[in-house]
UniProtKB/Swiss-Prot annotation:
Catalyzes the conversion of urocanate to 4-imidazolone-5-propionate. NAD(+) binds at residues 49-50, 127, 173-175, 193, 239-240, 260-264, 270-271, 319, 489. Pathway: Amino-acid degradation; L-histidine degradation into L-glutamate; N-formimidoyl-L-glutamate from L-histidine: step 2/3. GO terms for molecular function: urocanate hydratase activity. PROSITE patterns: UROCANASE. Keywords: Cytoplasm, Histidine metabolism, Lyase, NAD. Binds 1 NAD(+) per subunit. Belongs to the urocanase family. This is Urocanate hydratase. Pfam families: Urocanase (PF01175), Urocanase_C (PF17392), Urocanase_N (PF17391). One of its GO terms (biological process) is L-histidine catabolic process to glutamate and formate.
Length: 552
């Protein structure tokens, strides 16, 4: 992959570079994904998650930008794995962009085949929000992480993580949310990363409090704050596959254990034990097969240590990076003895159509986001947990790139909020249109048996019709751009998922599209969980009037 040193930053203000606000939104969000404040390796078009890219290569990126600048408001741009392949006449209510990233026929859906295609320049890895142009930096996963640790606190520690120690690893674009999410819940956390730059970045953005290269210092500080029942987050430089076994050897057991290293990609995402970053990069280039094998062996040691901590009483869970699967394939037959975070903590929210709803101010003006915060505090005042989140986010979350906000809203709430935002754009309360989107990790948009759809009540973990139906209904209902991806979060062969974005530009046409899309999109989450037999989803569907033909 050619590296290009250029600083990409989304335009701000109300001057259009394109022929309409929907096209402008797509252009700005693509560029925002590659803003140095947002992207992990912008010179390689890598946004987050190992090699999750916004475009296939620089030639494709430039062609997408040119296409968006000339795209008419009754045309649709098609993007195939980060490359623009066609512009067709459609209509004004159709999506302006349709994206399909990293999709492979199941028999060939593995990393080896993907890498062959990638080397030939035929495919890219889109992760979830990298290739669908709606990544907003670490805030994008922060509330989900906050909710996860909050639910763990409610289930196991009396509602707060005060006086507890969490041990985790991985401080990249996704995992970087963990330190702040734990301290927001009152706890102490040691977060390990092998790359000093990742820790430095989280400290710079106020997601992590301190840095150390010493395990002794990390433990001393952690114990001191745990005793005082005060929160602190400690970024520890090192390899989790070395540090966790060492802690087991010393009989040190944290209260909570998880992991968000990029274990989904053994070649590009995980560093084997005994290698520096530089040595790992050299081996990766010279002998990728040996690298992958060493990586998998290290992951197995990592999971063995997590299981040992679980056996000693630590609340242990997989945070969706497929590390258990790798260890299982390497012969660790009890790798799945600790659960994934969705069945352990998040599924009830999915049953209510809740998920990581986000919005971005195309103006670039933080005041536009602060005004929308006030809408949440006013319109959803009865949801104290949500309002607390908004207040904390305002105080503690630093914007990356275009100002944005995330919060988990459910069926009915999303459409209500979208309507209000569109009205605020129409009457000039907000200085420019707002982009509304979400993660692919949502209630009805993903099939991922080792993550979002793990341990479904009816055994339908691997049924992948749901994300396809989600993308189809969002497209016909007028989402601004819609994406269908493979392999996000857990790697090739383990997930299919869909994304959508809708632009609130203040027009009446946008109001109608928003109403349709922000009803059907979370509605798919309710429907999917009704179909799987969840009582809470059935209650939600009946209460909200979701039309499900065979619901009992």
């Amino acid at each position: 992959m050619e590296k290009v040193k250029q600083t990409i930053r989304a335009p701000r203000g109300t001057e259009l570079q394109t022929k309409g606000w929907v096209q402008e939104a797509a252009l700005r969000m693509l560029m925002n994904n590659l803003d140095p404040e947002v992207a992990e390796k912008p010179e390689e078009l890598v946004v987050y998650g190992g090699i999750g890219r916004a475009a296939r290569n620089w030639e494709s990126y430039n062609a997408i930008v040119d296409s968006l600048k000339t795209l008419e408001s009754d045309e649709t741009l098609l993007v195939q794995s980060g490359k623009p392949v066609a512009i067709f006449k459609s209509h004004e209510d159709a999506p302006r962009v349709l994206l399909a990233n990293s999709n492979l026929v199941p028999k060939w859906a593995n990393w080896n085949h993907f890498r062959e295609l990638e080397k030939k320049g035929l495919m890219m890895y889109g992760q979830m929000t990298a290739g669908s142009w709606i990544y907003i930096g670490t805030q994008g996963i922060l509330q989900g992480t906050y909710e996860t640790f909050g639910e763990a606190a409610r289930q196991h520690f009396g509602g707060s993580l005060k006086g507890t120690l969490t041990l985790t690893a991985g401080l990249g674009g996704m995992g970087g949310a963990q330190p702040l999410a734990v301290t927001m819940n009152g706890g102490v956390v040691i977060a390990i990363d092998v790359d000093k730059r990742s820790i430095d970045r989280r400290i710079e953005k106020r997601y992590c409090d301190m840095y150390t290269e010493s395990l002794e210092e990390a433990l001393t500080v952690a114990n001191e704050y745990k005793e005082k029942k005060e929160p602190i987050s400690i970024g520890l430089l090192g390899n989790a596959a070395e540090i966790l076994p060492e802690l087991v050897k010393r009989n040190i057991t944290p209260d909570l254990v998880t992991d968000q290293t990029s274990a989904h990609d053994p070649l590009n995402g995980y560093i084997p034990v005994g290698y520096t970053l530089e040595e790992a990069a050299k081996l990766r280039e010279e002998d990728p097969e040996r690298y992958v094998q060493l990586s998998k062996e290290s992951m197995t040691k990592h999971v063995e240590a997590m299981l040992a901590m679980q056996a000693k009483g630590a609340i242990t869970f997989d945070y969706g990076n497929n590390i258990r699967q790798v260890a299982f394939d390497e012969g660790l037959k009890n790798a799945f003895d600790f659960p994934g975070f969705v069945p352990a903590f998040i599924r009830p929210l999915f049953c209510e159509g809740k998920g990581p709803f986000r919005w971005v101010a195309l103006s670039g003006d933080p005041e536009d986001i602060y005004k929308t915060d006030e809408v949440i505090l006013r319109e959803f005042a009865d949801n104290e947990h949500l309002c607390n989140w908004i207040r904390m986010a305002r105080q503690q979350v630093e914007f990356q790139g275009l100002p944005s906000r995330i919060c988990w809203l459910g069926y009915g709430e999303r459409a209500k909020f979208g309507r209000i935002i569109n009205e605020m754009v129409a009457n000039g309360e907000l200085s420019a249109p707002i982009v509304i989107g979400r993660d692919h990790l949502d209630c009805g948009s993903v099939a991922s048996p080792n993550r979002e759809t793990e341990a479904m009540k009816d055994g339908s973990d691997a049924v992948a019709d749901w994300p396809i139906l989600n993308a189809l209904i969002n497209s016909v209902n007028g989402a601004s751009w819609v994406s269908v991806h493979h392999g996000g979060g857990v790697g090739m062969g383990y997930s299919l998922h869909a994304g959508m974005v809708i632009v609130a530009d203040g027009t009446e046409a946008a109001a109608k599209r928003i109403e349709r899309v922000l009803t059907s999109d979370p509605g798919m989450g309710v429907v999917r969980h009704v179909d799987a037999g969840y009582d809470l989803a059935v209650e939600t569907a009946k209460e909200k009037g979701v039309n499900i033909p065979m619901m009992k």
